[in-house]
């Protein structure tokens, strides 16, 4: 197994995840099997209970793992499915070591950061790297992104584990890529001093960067590269410019042009294979149409809904249609403005804030024949809206929101749950699709597997009344409602699951593909 460790310096939010995913895509384009691990140096066990406004989207894996959004980037760029073991947190590591100590596994030793914590970190990395793909094969290369910034106290045990692994691995099985900021001053000059200090901090920990990826707003020129090469003691070819791209899927192509593949091949002893051009053709595909979609949401931060944004992009690219997204605050938007959009999307979420605005948008889409896609909470609110305005249940609501007729109720198995973390209905579940429905048209098969993250469901006591008034539940998991739709509407479709988590640039999610196609067919904007 060959390992590529990715660290970051100067500041957080530089794009280490996109850099790591892009490196993986470059190697995959050359025929190598690639997997990825994300290290998050926080004490949380996982990302499930973290505030999305601070941390961004909680991405859900097939096994129900609630993880950092970077794992979503890995899955999309590499077209793989990861598991919870591919996300290593300080909380997981410490919990495991403490459990071992309580069992007596250390035979009376004094348990310390070194060697016990670092040994557990190395074990977690190796176990994740060795997991097999569905076809029974294993990865040739494992990417390991170390979250945080070099110098942070939280990252120290992980960086020490990386240092130890360098000594334990063959010289051609290890490479360290350091992502750093090259800012522009008021005169427009690119400054290398932050990079120099970042590399110095890395060296103080016993680590040496084999490749430096320079993040900047514009291309880093030859003179700046030479300066970084000289001061950071590595070949000029190992200084890679990574300017901010218009589209993140273009980053692998830009890094390929910088020659990073050849540098990696030399360090890792990889055969230099021809590059598969299919990624280039996909990313450079031209748009011939454009639609505008309103996303009525609770949070005004795009990273909270990054998988939705990417799924719309995947569908648009497949249909040669550029999808422009307009974010509407569910509590503040003007209802009359909804007529200006080709489609309306209601994303998932939790809590009561903003739900009436979302319900109003759903009603507008239903009554005015505007293409609508609802996801998770959007599915539940579509049920509530229909119950209120078509079934005459004026106080229809969800048990999550308070008193009223609970057309949305708590899942029975949730009634005994006392902890928040990792206790929802999470991960892959199978749904059976009814024949002659929109769901069947979208998926083209009678059984599907999609990822879930919820505690509430359609109350079985109201299903008959809802269906009598025309609502169709077109997919179910046993007695649970998974999809709903409205016959006679151009596109009114909602899912209890999150189809965006399985969308890929090469394989768009069927509900998103159908939604964008309906937006294009019912275009209102210019």
UniProtKB/Swiss-Prot annotation:
GO terms for biological process: 'de novo' CTP biosynthetic process; pyrimidine nucleobase biosynthetic process. Pfam families: CTP_synth_N, GATase. Its EC number is 6.3.4.2. L-glutamine binds at residues 349, 377-380, 400, 455. UTP binds at residues 12, 191-196, 227. Coiled coil: none annotated. It is an enzyme of class 6 (ligase). PROSITE patterns: GATASE_TYPE_1. It catalyses: UTP + L-glutamine + ATP + H2O = CTP + L-glutamate + ADP + phosphate + 2 H(+); L-glutamine + H2O = L-glutamate + NH4(+); UTP + NH4(+) + ATP = CTP + ADP + phosphate + 2 H(+). Residues 1-270 are annotated as: Amidoligase domain. It comes from the Archaea. InterPro entries: Class_I_gatase-like, CTP_synthase, CTP_synthase_N, GATASE, GATase1_CTP_Synthase, P-loop_NTPase. Allosterically activated by GTP, when glutamine is the substrate; GTP has no effect on the reaction when ammonia is the substrate. The allosteric effector GTP functions by stabilizing the protein conformation that binds the tetrahedral intermediate(s) formed during glutamine hydrolysis. Inhibited by the product CTP, via allosteric rather than competitive inhibition. The active site is at residues 376, 498, 500. Mg(2+) binds at residues 70, 145. One of its GO terms (molecular function) is CTP synthase activity. CTP binds at residues 12, 152-154, 191-196, 227. Keywords: ATP-binding, Glutamine amidotransferase, Ligase, Magnesium, Metal-binding, Nucleotide-binding, Pyrimidine biosynthesis. Pathway: Pyrimidine metabolism; CTP biosynthesis via de novo pathway; CTP from UDP: step 2/2. ATP binds at residues 13-18, 70. Residues 293-525 form the Glutamine amidotransferase type-1 domain. Homotetramer. Belongs to the CTP synthase family. CTPSs have evolved a hybrid strategy for distinguishing between UTP and CTP. The overlapping regions of the product feedback inhibitory and substrate sites recognize a common feature in both compounds, the triphosphate moiety. To differentiate isosteric substrate and product pyrimidine rings, an additional pocket far from the expected kinase/ligase catalytic site, specifically recognizes the cytosine and ribose portions of the product inhibitor. Catalyzes the ATP-dependent amination of UTP to CTP with either L-glutamine or ammonia as the source of nitrogen. Regulates intracellular CTP levels through interactions with the four ribonucleotide triphosphates. This is CTP synthase. It comes from Methanoregula boonei (strain DSM 21154 / JCM 14090 / 6A8).
């Amino acid at each position: 197994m060959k390992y590529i460790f990715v660290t970051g310096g100067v500041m957080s939010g530089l794009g280490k995840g996109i850099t790591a995913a892009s490196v993986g895509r470059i190697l995959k384009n050359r025929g190598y099997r690639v997997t990825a691990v994300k290290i998050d140096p926080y004490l949380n066990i996982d990302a499930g209970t973290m505030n999305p406004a601070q941390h961004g989207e909680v991405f859900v894996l097939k096994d129900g793992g609630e993880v950092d959004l970077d794992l979503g980037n890995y899955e999309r760029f590499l077209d793989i499915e990861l598991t919870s073991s591919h996300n290593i947190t300080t909380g997981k590591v410490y919990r495991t070591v403490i459990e071992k100590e309580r069992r007596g596994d250390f035979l009376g030793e004094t348990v310390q950061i070194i060697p016990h914590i670092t040994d557990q970190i190395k074990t977690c990395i190796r176990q994740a790297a060795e997991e097999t793909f569905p076809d029974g094969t294993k990865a040739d290369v494992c990417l390991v992104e170390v979250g945080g910034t070099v110098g942070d106290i939280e990252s120290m045990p992980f960086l020490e584990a990386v240092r130890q692994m360098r000594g334990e691995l063959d010289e051609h099985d290890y490479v360290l890529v350091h992502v750093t900021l090259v800012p522009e001053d008021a005169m427009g000059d690119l400054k290398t001093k932050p990079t120099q200090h970042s590399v110095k901090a890395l060296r103080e920990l016993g680590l040496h960067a084999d490749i430096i990826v320079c993040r900047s707003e514009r291309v880093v020129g030859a003179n700046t590269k030479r300066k970084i090469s000289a001061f950071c003691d590595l070949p000029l070819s190992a200084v890679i410019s990574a300017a901010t791209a218009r589209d993140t899927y273009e980053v692998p192509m830009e890094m390929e042009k910088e020659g990073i593949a050849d540098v990696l091949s030399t360090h890792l002893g990889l055969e230099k294979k021809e590059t598969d051009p299919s990624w280039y053709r996909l990313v450079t595909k031209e748009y011939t149409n454009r639609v505008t979609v309103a996303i009525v949401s609770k949070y005004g931060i795009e990273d909270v809904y990054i998988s939705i944004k990417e799924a719309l992009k995947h569908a648009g690219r497949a249909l040669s249609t550029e999808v422009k997204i307009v974010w509407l605050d569910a509590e503040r938007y003007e209802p009359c403005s909804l007529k200006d959009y080709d489609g309306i999307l209601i994303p998932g979420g939790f809590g009561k804030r903003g739900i009436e605005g979302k319900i109003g948008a759903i009603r507008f889409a239903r009554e005015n024949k505007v293409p609508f896609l609802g996801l998770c909470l959007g599915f539940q609110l579509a049920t509530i809206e229909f119950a209120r305005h078509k079934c005459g249940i004026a106080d229809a609501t969800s048990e999550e929101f308070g008193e009223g007729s609970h057309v949305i109720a708590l899942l029975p198995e949730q009634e005994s749950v006392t902890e928040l973390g990792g206790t929802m209905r999470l991960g892959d579940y199978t749904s059976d699709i009814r024949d002659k429905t929109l769901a069947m048209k979208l998926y083209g098969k009678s059984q599907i597997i999609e990822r879930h993250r919820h505690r509430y469901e359609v109350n079985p006591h109201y299903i008959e009344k809802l269906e009598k008034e025309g609502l169709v539940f077109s997919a179910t998991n046993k007695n649970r409602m998974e999809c709903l739709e409205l016959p006679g509407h151009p596109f009114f479709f909602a899912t209890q699951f999150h189809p965006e988590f399985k969308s890929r640039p090469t394989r768009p999610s069927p509900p998103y593909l159908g939604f964008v196609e309906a937006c294009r067919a019912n275009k209102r904007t210019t």
